[in-house]
Amino acid sequence: MRVGVLAVQGAFIEHEKILQNLGVECLELRNGKDARQDVEGLILPGGESTTQGKLLRELDMFEPLREKIVAGLPVLATCAGLILLAEELANDSARYFATLPVRVKRNAYGRQLGSFYTEEQFGDLGKVPMTFIRAPYIESVGEGVEILAKVKGDIVGVRYKNQIGLSFHPELNGDRRIHQMFLDSISDGKSAPCKQKAV
């Protein structure tokens, strides 16, 4: 199995280490040629979403990756990656891939709680460690979106067809269960194409 990892900015190395420990080949995606390579899954890591969005376009990666996501390529998106997938951003006109029917608020926890750690229930996996770093959260979800996790009432994890979006960083805690769930969804072929929306 080969998974593409967006590697233009952000915490991509940590994702790669977990995937490699799970026996998965990683392809770092750094330019348009990389973005057009065949992969069986895609990781959109944390980082700075505005910078990532700008680089995706400048490096000719935006359209080929968006086409893959729309066609049903399984995606695991964390923190900034969630922002890239979101159809709508609160108090922000910016839009990126816009393939995940959720409304996301950037830096939702403010400066005092900009970074924190907790353990909460995640789908059927039980309690998992969650590290939040200047994290967004999901204000609302559209039809067909499964809520996987909440922290103090705020939605921090969702699944929609081929896309898993997380507010937190599962790659920073050494717990492999979420990555394994993502890989299992690839192996099981559970992902499905998402509806095309105009950008």
Curated annotation (Swiss-Prot):
Q: Report residues binding L-glutamine.
A: 47-49, 106, 133-134
Q: Report whether Transmembrane shows up as a keyword of the record.
A: no
Q: Catalyzes what?
A: aldehydo-D-ribose 5-phosphate + D-glyceraldehyde 3-phosphate + L-glutamine = pyridoxal 5'-phosphate + L-glutamate + phosphate + 3 H2O + H(+); L-glutamine + H2O = L-glutamate + NH4(+)
- Enzyme nomenclature, EC number: 4.3.3.6, 3.5.1.2
Q: Name one GO molecular function term.
A: glutaminase activity
Keyword Hydrolase carried by entry: yes
Q: Which Gene3D superfamilies match?
A: 3.40.50.880
What domain of life is recorded for the organism?
Bacteria
This protein's GO cellular component annotations are: cytosol; glutaminase complex
Q: Which GO terms describe its biological process?
A: glutamine catabolic process; pyridoxal phosphate biosynthetic process; pyridoxine metabolic process
Instruction: Describe which pathway this protein belongs to, using the record's wording.
Output: Cofactor biosynthesis; pyridoxal 5'-phosphate biosynthesis
PROSITE patterns of this UniProt entry? PDXT_SNO_1, PDXT_SNO_2
Concerning Pfam families, the annotation shows: SNO
UniProt family annotation: Belongs to the glutaminase PdxT/SNO family.
What functional role does this protein have? Catalyzes the hydrolysis of glutamine to glutamate and ammonia as part of the biosynthesis of pyridoxal 5'-phosphate. The resulting ammonia molecule is channeled to the active site of PdxS.
Partners and quaternary state?
A: In the presence of PdxS, forms a dodecamer of heterodimers. Only shows activity in the heterodimer.
**Matches recorded under PANTHER family:** PYRIDOXAL 5'-PHOSPHATE SYNTHASE SUBUNIT SNO (PTHR31559), PYRIDOXAL 5'-PHOSPHATE SYNTHASE SUBUNIT SNO1-RELATED (PTHR31559:SF0)
According to UniProt, the name of this protein is: Pyridoxal 5'-phosphate synthase subunit PdxT
What species does this protein belong to?
Answer: Desulfitobacterium hafniense (strain Y51)
- Gene giving rise to this polypeptide: pdxT
